[in-house]
Regions:
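Active-site-lining helix/loop region of Rossmann-like oxidoreductase modules
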Residues: 18, 22-25, 87, 233, ...
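Short catalytic-loop micro-motif centered on adjacent basic/acidic residues
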Residues: 211-214, 235-239, 263
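Short, acidic/turn-prone active-site loops that include or flank metal/cofactor-
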Residues: 217-218, 240-242
């Protein structure tokens, strides 16, 4: 797929990565980690596009002509206007002495005002936000200006957008989501069905910016798919699934291969960061739980009648998320067995 922002050519220099939720735990860790890896201060590990320090490993970046870490340029939006250095210190994933080594690089990156409404995330406060007096259309135009300015400022030929924002409340698909014409009418009428996430994706599609939705918030609706396909814009994603659901899909696949029946699966998550605070709101919690719960039946190949997923905000955990799983299974001749997994991530 080709667009004015993303071309299928050999090597096009630096790649702009714009992030919704730039100062959040995941995004700030990503940017700080890349800065540290560029200086050789931490190992290049646990990435699909890097060789894990193996001398003879083939790099996917070379094979598929992906951008290297050295080519990445970061920008994005956040509800907090502090620098990435301040955000990274606050989240505490990397040690203060490590962050000191890349302080200048991180202090140079400050987020742009974000599109936000408490209607979609009750437990968040928006201090650094795009004005709402222009309605949905005005906010979309502000997003487009930010993307264009970022691209021009850094002399970039290509930009991608990644949604790492906190989870929005659960939304059902309605008529406004079904056609592009209806969606655009919803923009003009400030329809509440056009969420902040959807406004970002619409703006990205308008400029030909490929985008990935790393959050479970509803974005992959027919209207936006039509717009992306009309403009030749690649898109992907519906929740990153890097914690408990990562373990769940791996274990469920193994159980299916060994023909073990899953009788029940009880999952609990504890997290104490801003994402946990957002998920303490029942409306946002429902979005995440539905995303987590939806994966199991399709992987094990049968309906798991006793499948529970719970998410709790527990402030002492901070960014060190913890997941507990209790799995009840039936083995040979129906003999009961049980597995317990505790994943700190």
């Amino acid at each position: 797929l080709q667009s004015s922002f993303a071309h299928n050519e050999e090597h096009m220099g630096r790649l702009g990565v714009v992030i919704i939720g730039l100062n959040g735990a995941v995004a700030s860790t990503l940017v700080a980690g890349v800065a540290l890896m560029k200086k050789g201060l931490v190992p290049r590990r646990a990435m699909l596009t890097e060789p894990d320090d193996a001398v003879n490993a083939e790099k996917l970046t070379d094979l598929l002509q992906f951008a290297s870490l050295e080519d990445l340029v970061f920008g994005g939006w956040d509800l907090n206007d502090e620098s990435l250095y301040e955000a990274s210190l606050k989240h505490g994933v990397f040690r203060a002495d490590e962050l000191q080594e890349v302080k200048a690089e991180l202090e140079a990156v400050r987020p742009w005002p974000a599109v936000f409404s408490r209607e979609y995330a009750q437990n968040l406060q928006g201090r650094h936000v795009v004005a709402t007096d222009g309605g949905h259309r005005g906010q979309i135009e502000a997003i487009k200006r930010d993307l264009t300015t970022f691209k021009e400022k850094h002399g970039l030929r290509r930009v991608v957008l990644v949604n790492l924002a906190s989870t929005e409340k659960w939304m059902e698909r309605t008529a406004v989501h079904e056609t592009l014409e209806g969606f655009e009418k919803g923009i003009e009428s400030n329809d509440p069905g056009v969420s902040p996430t959807m406004r970002y994706m619409y703006a990205a599609n308008s400029l030909g910016v490929p985008h990935a939705n790393f959050a479970p918030s509803l974005a992959n609706v027919p209207a936006l798919r039509i717009q992306a396909e009309n403009n030749g814009v690649p898109y992907c994603g519906m929740d990153g699934k890097t914690g408990q659901t990562l373990v769940k899909t791996a274990m469920a696949s193994m159980l299916r291969l060994r023909r073990l029946m899953v009788d029940g699966w009880y999952s609990v998550n504890f997290l104490g960061n801003n994402d946990g605070l957002v998920l303490d709101d029942p409306a946002s919690n429902q979005t995440k739980i539905r995303s987590k719960a939806s994966v199991l039946d399709s992987v094990v190949g049968h309906k798991v009648e006793n499948h529970q997923v719970h998410i709790h905000y527990y402030k002492p955990r901070g960014d060190a998320k913890e997941a507990w799983d209790n799995i009840d299974i039936s083995g040979f001749c129906g003999q009961p067995m049980q597995m317990k997994i505790n994943f700190l991530c």
